[in-house]
Curated annotation (Swiss-Prot):
<dbReference type="InterPro" id="IPR000672">
    <property type="entry name" value="THF_DH/CycHdrlase"/>
</dbReference>
<keyword id="KW-0554">One-carbon metabolism</keyword>
<dbReference type="Pfam" id="PF00763">
    <property type="entry name" value="THF_DHG_CYH"/>
</dbReference>
<dbReference type="GO" id="GO:0035999">
    <property type="term" value="P:tetrahydrofolate interconversion"/>
</dbReference>
<keyword id="KW-0028">Amino-acid biosynthesis</keyword>
<keyword id="KW-0511">Multifunctional enzyme</keyword>
<dbReference type="InterPro" id="IPR046346">
    <property type="entry name" value="Aminoacid_DH-like_N_sf"/>
</dbReference>
<dbReference type="GO" id="GO:0004477">
    <property type="term" value="F:methenyltetrahydrofolate cyclohydrolase activity"/>
</dbReference>
<dbReference type="GO" id="GO:0005829">
    <property type="term" value="C:cytosol"/>
</dbReference>
<keyword id="KW-0560">Oxidoreductase</keyword>
<dbReference type="GO" id="GO:0009086">
    <property type="term" value="P:methionine biosynthetic process"/>
</dbReference>
<dbReference type="GO" id="GO:0006164">
    <property type="term" value="P:purine nucleotide biosynthetic process"/>
</dbReference>
<protein>
    <recommendedName>
        <fullName>Bifunctional protein FolD</fullName>
        <ecNumber>1.5.1.5</ecNumber>
        <ecNumber>3.5.4.9</ecNumber>
    </recommendedName>
</protein>
<keyword id="KW-0378">Hydrolase</keyword>
<feature type="binding site">
    <location>
        <position position="190"/>
    </location>
    <ligand>
        <name>NADP(+)</name>
    </ligand>
</feature>
<feature type="binding site">
    <location>
        <begin position="165"/>
        <end position="167"/>
    </location>
    <ligand>
        <name>NADP(+)</name>
    </ligand>
</feature>
<dbReference type="GO" id="GO:0000105">
    <property type="term" value="P:L-histidine biosynthetic process"/>
</dbReference>
Length: 286
């Protein structure tokens, strides 16, 4: 069998059209969602990613701004800027682009974001709400993964789902979202023994560790659904996923490519959460 290719670009395009329609409806009520992104320093990849978010937000009718601070900015300066945005009533959602320079504590900054404007979903309050099944803002990559599975009409109930990676950004939250859909979830990580035995029994594999070629054809069950979150640049700058794509697609039931799989949905869910933040503060039901 040859796998169904889960085209993240097309799924994102369709989803963003729905978001654009909702933004237009909000504007008719006199409200325009605004996304503010804090960028500290001049890291090329971060600058590119921030520009992509701004462009995507504006394309669906939102307002977006980049607050660019110098690489030498102190933690206090970043916190002051963040506090200004927290108190700015025109701002619906805030995100802080990571990584941050070494003099700035990432955790301290993330905890200083107003939880009601935390469109990345990384504030401890929002993480906690996810774990008691009362989530509002969910981290964007896990949310995007669930949209891909939903779009592909993958029934997760009772399925064996294996998540490789235990980060707070992807691995742990996506495991919780899969549990909410009644999947039986196993989390594997760098200390796990005999990973192959778990993978061979998996109906769904989500790999998010950044190790190209980690998931090979011999450990994938025929018909399994493969979600590849890896995006490691090779020596030529070409992005590689965690999955041996060309081989695994010959046996899998469905698979995401890299690039063009999960990535487009991550930015889309930033927009989704920004819209949600605006609706919540205006008392408008989603």
């Amino acid at each position: 069998m040859v796998a169904k290719i889960l085209d993240g670009k097309q799924i994102a395009k369709d989803y963003r059209q729905g978001l654009q329609n909702q933004v237009e409806a909000l504007k008719e009520k006199g409200f325009t969602p605004k996304l503010s992104v804090i960028l500290v320093g001049n890291d090329g990849a971060s600058q590119s990613y921030v520009r992509s978010k701004k462009k995507a937000a504006e394309k669906i009718g939102m307002i977006s701004e980049i607050v660019h601070l110098e690489e030498t900015a102190t933690e206090e300066e970043v916190l002051n800027e963040l506090n200004r945005l927290n108190n700015d009533d025109s701002v619906s959602g805030i995100l802080v682009q990571v990584p941050l320079p070494k003099q700035v504590s990432e955790q301290k900054i993330l905890e200083a974001i107003n939880p009601d404007k935390d469109v990345d979903g990384f504030h401890p309050i929002n993480i906690g709400k996810l774990y008691i099944d009362e989530q509002t803002f969910v981290p964007c990559t896990p949310l995007g993964i669930m949209e891909i599975l939903k779009h592909a009409d993958i029934d997760l109930e009772g399925k064996n789902a294996v998540v490789i990676g235990r980060s707070h950004i992807v691995g742990q939250p996506v495991s919780k979202l899969l549990l909410q859909k009644n999947a039986s979830v196993t989390i594997l990580h760098s200390r796990s023994k005999d990973m192959a035995s778990y993978l061979k029994d998996a109906d769904v594999i989500v790999s998010a560790v950044g190790k190209p070629g980690l998931v090979t054809k011999d450990v994938v069950k025929e018909g399994a659904v493969i979600i590849d979150v890896g995006n490691t640049p090779d020596e030529n700058g070409k992005l590689k996923g965690d999955v041996d794509y060309d081989a695994v697609k010959e046996i899998a039931g469905a698979i995401t490519p890299v690039p063009g799989g999960v990535g487009p949905l991550t930015i889309t869910m930033v927009l989704n959460n920004t819209l949600l933040a605006e609706k919540m503060r205006r008392g408008i039901d989603s």
